[in-house]
Amino acid sequence: MSQLDLNALNELPKVDRVMALAETNAQLEKLSAEERVAWALENLPGEYVLSSSFGIQAAVSLHLVNQIRPDIPVILTDTGYLFPETYQFIDELTDKLKLNLKVYRAGESPAWQEARYGKLWEQGVEGIEKYNEINKVEPMNRALKELKAQTWFAGLRREQSGSRAHLPVLAIQRGVFKVLPIIDWDNRTVYQYLQKHGLKYHPLWDQGYLSVGDTHTTRKWEPGMAEEETRFFGLKRECGLHEG
């Protein structure tokens, strides 16, 4: 696979960037998740970061990447509305895996946001998008800038939703390389990895949650529901971090 120039690629239109990365992605599809991480660390520029929402299967990518690159900064965008079990899970995994956790938050506290805007998540798609911009997108952009990131690892998988079904292993987002090492893993592979390494699902998994975000926009799975319907009242799947 040829060397990639981030600055040159950023100057291209999005369609041309996709085409420029096509050959590399074809080769990356043939590699294991561990090999993809190793390739990225060898061939893509630093600084390197890993983002995590500490969701249902978060332990997989946290363990996988941190094993190969110990002390990699792990970015969490904390909305202040996560489940108590999520905060406990964050503490547990940070201690168990010795994570270099970097927490980023909005400039306005949750209470101040509610005073200013009301409950944005109850204001339809437009309100949800504004909420996500304030609490997810802006803090992530700030994290990438402050940590001088040029290569960003994330734990997205194609099986999780229609919006992720065609994502490549390697892309450029927010001006940096984005690497998705476990993009082609199915639920069985995730389960086997967790079992092999003595890792746990998020505590709410046992209560019927397939996906976990904020308390006010996360629903327990019910028979007949698609996984996408458990988040943002079925209006959206993505929180904004992995769009654009």
From Swiss-Prot:
Its main location: cytoplasm. It is found in: Cytoplasm. InterPro entries: PAPS/APS_Rdtase, PAPS_reduct_dom, PAPS_reductase_CysH, Rossmann-like_a/b/a_fold. GO terms for cellular component: cytoplasm. The active site is at C239. Its EC number is 1.8.4.8. The keyword Lipid biosynthesis does not apply. It catalyses: [thioredoxin]-disulfide + sulfite + adenosine 3',5'-bisphosphate + 2 H(+) = [thioredoxin]-dithiol + 3'-phosphoadenylyl sulfate. GO terms for biological process: hydrogen sulfide biosynthetic process; sulfate assimilation, phosphoadenylyl sulfate reduction by phosphoadenylyl-sulfate reductase (thioredoxin). Gene3D superfamilies: HUPs. Pathway: Sulfur metabolism; hydrogen sulfide biosynthesis; sulfite from sulfate: step 3/3. Keywords: Cytoplasm, Oxidoreductase. One of its GO terms (molecular function) is phosphoadenylyl-sulfate reductase (thioredoxin) activity. Catalyzes the formation of sulfite from phosphoadenosine 5'-phosphosulfate (PAPS) using thioredoxin as an electron donor. NCBIfam families: cysH, PAPS_reductase, PRK02090.1. Belongs to the PAPS reductase family. CysH subfamily. This is Phosphoadenosine 5'-phosphosulfate reductase. It comes from Salmonella typhimurium (strain LT2 / SGSC1412 / ATCC 700720).
